[in-house]
Amino acid sequence: MNDFGARTRRLLRGRRAEASGRDAEDIAAAALAREGWAVLARRARTPAGEIDLVAERAGLVAFVEVKARPSLREAAFALGARQRARLVAAAECWVAANPGHGPAGIRFDVVIVAADGTARRIADAFRVGD
């Protein structure tokens, strides 16, 4: 019985986290659109992993990782080296599958979203090889 209860709690926690992540992605996509970015893809799946948002403005493609945390301070430290490497690999797959985008280059942004809906975008948050 305890094992069943633990699995149920994990499942519910996972569903809440997914819903929170989707809400944060909605907030991030709206913020990008207000700044003139066209959101090309949401939750883009590639062989190397998923990209939360892919956006383009003036020929520049931004691969955006969205992080939802209780506070902006906590979210700012939520992207580790392994996640950065995964995002770079996923971006390479996306570019290969979507030729013609990004003639002005690509970059990696992070949008951090606090529980109160406050969002902050860190443009060019890291570079390949960081």
Predicted regions mapped to residue ranges:
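Hydrophobic residues on conserved beta-strands that form the core of alpha/beta folds
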Residues: 39-41, 63, 108
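A generic beta-sheet turn/junction motif
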Residues: 46-48, 57-59, 115
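Protein kinase-like catalytic core scaffold
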Residues: 49, 60-62, 109, 120
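Conserved catalytic cores of phosphodiester-cleaving nucleases, focusing on short active-site segments
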Residues: 51-75, 87
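Mg2+/Mn2+-dependent nuclease catalytic core
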Residues: 70-93, 97
